[in-house]
Design a protein with these regions (language model features):
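Active-site beta->alpha loop and helix N-cap motifs at the rims of alpha/beta catalytic domains
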Residues: 2-6, 31-94
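Short beta-strand segments at enzyme active-site cores
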Residues: 17-27, 54-58, 117, 241
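Mid-to-C-terminal alpha-helical segments outside catalytic/metal-binding sites
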Residues: 222, 226-248
Length: 248
């Protein structure tokens, strides 16, 4: 429910999370892009997690076509943006050029910073090209999504090449990584080690380890925080995170 999401977000915020990546669901638990539900979620997070960066998902799980961007007029700080298609375990994750450009345009209109979700090398190249043409609002922020079957593998050599590609084609760009399932912890470590940022949480991984289910999003945030401390990279406060991303 929305109230459960707000409570979970507050726990994660207290644990050190600075960005909330959010989806919403119907009462029957099916995914939706209903702007009214996103509005309630945004209101609750803004009230209980003041100044936390709110990021809405425009992914294909909760709708099709322009329905996926129906919540953008609510003006979250950020929104996810997929800039290419790829295979998932049982389906094609389709993002047509027309839809990509429309979503990017809506984000520019409403001054929303995209988090580009890259499931493939071509997505990284496309994101850099879109940024160079002024099609993306704000600085480029790319997330490498690794470990989904039939898509980008969680392989360090691949990861390192993607980091070098971003640094070569658009120096000083911001990037982060998301590891799916058992790959979450190792992606956290790779990102922190190489100077990037991390995503964690129950959407991508439901376990602390092979035998233990994660009790909450906050428990996974705490693991990421511990890795940061191991590499002497203290987690950013919400204020510092907004400075890094140049969000007001």
């Amino acid at each position: 429910s929305i109230s459960e999401q707000i409570e979970s977000t507050h726990e994660s915020f207290e644990a050190g999370a600075t960005i909330c990546h959010a989806h919403v669901r119907n009462e029957d638990e099916t995914p939706t892009s209903d702007p009214e539900k996103f509005a309630l979620l945004k209101e609750g997070i803004s009230k209980h997690c003041q100044d936390m960066i709110i990021q809405f998902s425009t992914g294909g799980r909760s709708g099709s076509g322009k329905e996926r961007g129906g919540m953008l007029p609510l003006k979250p700080d950020m929104a996810s943006l997929s800039v290419g298609s790829n295979n998932f375990p049982t389906r094609v994750y389709e993002n047509s050029p027309e839809l990509i450009l429309w979503l990017a345009e809506q984000m520019r209109i409403h001054k929303i910073m995209p988090e580009v979700e890259a499931f493939d090398l071509s997505h990284i190249i496309n994101a850099i090209d879109m940024h160079s043409k002024g099609l993306l609002f704000g600085d480029l922020y790319v997330q490498f999504v690794m470990g989904i079957k039939n898509a980008m593998p969680a392989d360090f050599d691949v990861f390192e090449y993607y980091v070098k590609t971003v640094d070569r084609l658009l120096p000083k760009s911001l990037w982060c990584g998301a590891g799916i399932g058992k790959n979450q912890r190792i992606l956290n470590e790779w990102c922190i080690k190489l100077g990037g940022h991390v995503r964690t949480g129950l959407e991508d991984n439901i376990r602390i380890d092979k035998e233990t289910l994660a009790p909450s999003n906050a428990s996974l945030v705490k693991i990421a925080k511990e890795i940061c401390e191991q590499y002497n990279r203290p987690i950013a406060s919400w204020k510092k995170a907004r400075e890094i991303l140049e969000l007001g």
